[in-house]
């Protein structure tokens, strides 16, 4: 099971993710309380082994913003959380995760247009895209129409519910941010417990 820890801002949190077996580490460049600059992400990325993929999270970025981050950090994957056209995803010089908010149990009509991207299902956004700490309605989703080897589940995951999510969706990976925080800050102990719990599912 691929595990992505998202919204990291401190070296100690990156270290906790690395030491406990995270497969992807996410840096948020979109406006949010977890936002980092390219320079900050570059410094944090120095402590990430090459076998762990570095992901940049964006909302409706320009081509220039994407290119600057991909080269400056550098990034292996870009995660697009806005209304980005498929053409932008196809032109990007990195792998792509396209995030879709699941509203009222419905998958977006254009989800199949992103043929080469990983598909991330998340709860509907509130103040900003992602990191809301809320789950979408798992019972209403027919994940059979999605490619399991491209599917990533996010939205309100934590150590208590991640095993159920994995059994239900059989995804390629799971993505967490607020579920490994205490009082709005990343918690190394929660990072450790979540990764071990997610990877312990048979």
Curated annotation (Swiss-Prot):
| Cysteine disulfide partners in this protein | none
One Pfam family linked to the record: PRAI
Q: What catalytic activity does the UniProt entry give for this protein?
A: N-(5-phospho-beta-D-ribosyl)anthranilate = 1-(2-carboxyphenylamino)-1-deoxy-D-ribulose 5-phosphate
Report keywords, A-Z: Amino-acid biosynthesis, Aromatic amino acid biosynthesis, Isomerase, Tryptophan biosynthesis
What would you give as a GO molecular function for this chain, any one? Answer: phosphoribosylanthranilate isomerase activity
InterPro entries, per the entry: Aldolase_TIM (IPR013785), PRAI_dom (IPR001240), RibuloseP-bd_barrel (IPR011060), TrpF_fam (IPR044643)
Q: What is its EC number?
A: 5.3.1.24
Question: Transcription: is it a keyword of this entry?
Answer: no
Which GO BP terms apply?
L-tryptophan biosynthetic process
Specify the domain of life of the species encoding this protein: Bacteria
Keyword Oxidoreductase part of the UniProt annotation: no
Show the PANTHER family listed in the entry.
Answer: N-(5'-PHOSPHORIBOSYL)ANTHRANILATE ISOMERASE
For this chain, the family text in UniProt reads: Belongs to the TrpF family.
HAMAP family, A to Z: PRAI
Instruction: Return the protein name.
Output: N-(5'-phosphoribosyl)anthranilate isomerase
């Amino acid at each position: 099971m691929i595990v992505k820890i998202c919204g990291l801002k401190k070296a100690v949190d990156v270290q906790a993710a690395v030491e406990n077996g995270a497969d992807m580490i996410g840096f948020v460049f979109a406006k949010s309380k977890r936002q980092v600059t390219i320079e900050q992400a570059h410094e944090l990325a120095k402590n990430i082994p090459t076998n762990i993929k570095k992901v940049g999270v964006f909302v409706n970025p320009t081509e220039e913003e994407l290119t600057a981050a991909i080269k400056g950090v550098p990034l292996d994957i870009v995660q697009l959380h806005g209304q980005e056209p498929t053409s932008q995803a196809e032109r990007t010089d990195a792998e792509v995760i396209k995030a879709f908010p699941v509203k009222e149990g419905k998958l977006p009509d254009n989800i199949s247009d992103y043929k080469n991207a990983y598909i991330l299902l998340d709860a509907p956004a509130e103040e900003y895209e992602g990191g809301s700490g809320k789950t979408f309605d798992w019972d209403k989703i027919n994940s059979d129409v999605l490619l399991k080897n491209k599917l990533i589940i996010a939205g309100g995951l934590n150590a208590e519910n991640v095993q159920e999510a994995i059994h239900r969706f059989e995804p390629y990976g799971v993505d967490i941010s607020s579920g490994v925080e205490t009082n709005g800050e990343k918690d190394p102990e929660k990072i450790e417990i979540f990764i071990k719990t997610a990877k312990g599912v048979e």
